[in-house]
């Protein structure tokens, strides 16, 4: 059984027991969260597709950890003009473990 849900403006395909990295959520580690924006649920041959969301579709998950991703370097450079600019960015994330899918 798997499902597709929406969180942080992105869509994620998950199955039970899987750990997913999402955009940062303001929820403490160890707490549970329910995602109601379920776009699709598939159980073998039976597939439910939402318009836009599946009625009664809920994905339950437990927050495992928070952290920051790898550093991305941004470089601006103009040749022959003595202009160089560097900037770095590390995006916050939340790891969640899917504990249940229902539709």
From Swiss-Prot:
Q: Which UniProt keywords apply?
A: Ribonucleoprotein, Ribosomal protein, RNA-binding, rRNA-binding
Question: What are the GO BP annotations of this UniProt entry?
Answer: translation
Q: Which GO terms describe its cellular component?
A: cytoplasm; ribonucleoprotein complex; ribosome
Molecular-function GO term, any one: structural constituent of ribosome
Q: Which domain of life is it from?
A: Bacteria
InterPro entries membership: bL21-like, bL21-like_sf, Ribosomal_bL21, Ribosomal_bL21_CS
Q: Which Pfam families match?
A: Ribosomal_L21p
UniProt subunit comment: Part of the 50S ribosomal subunit. Contacts protein L20.
Q: State its role.
A: This protein binds to 23S rRNA in the presence of protein L20.
HAMAP family, sorted: Ribosomal_bL21 (MF_01363)
The record's family statement is: Belongs to the bacterial ribosomal protein bL21 family.
Protein name listed in UniProt? Large ribosomal subunit protein bL21
Q: Which organism is it from?
A: Salmonella schwarzengrund (strain CVM19633)
Gene behind this chain? rplU
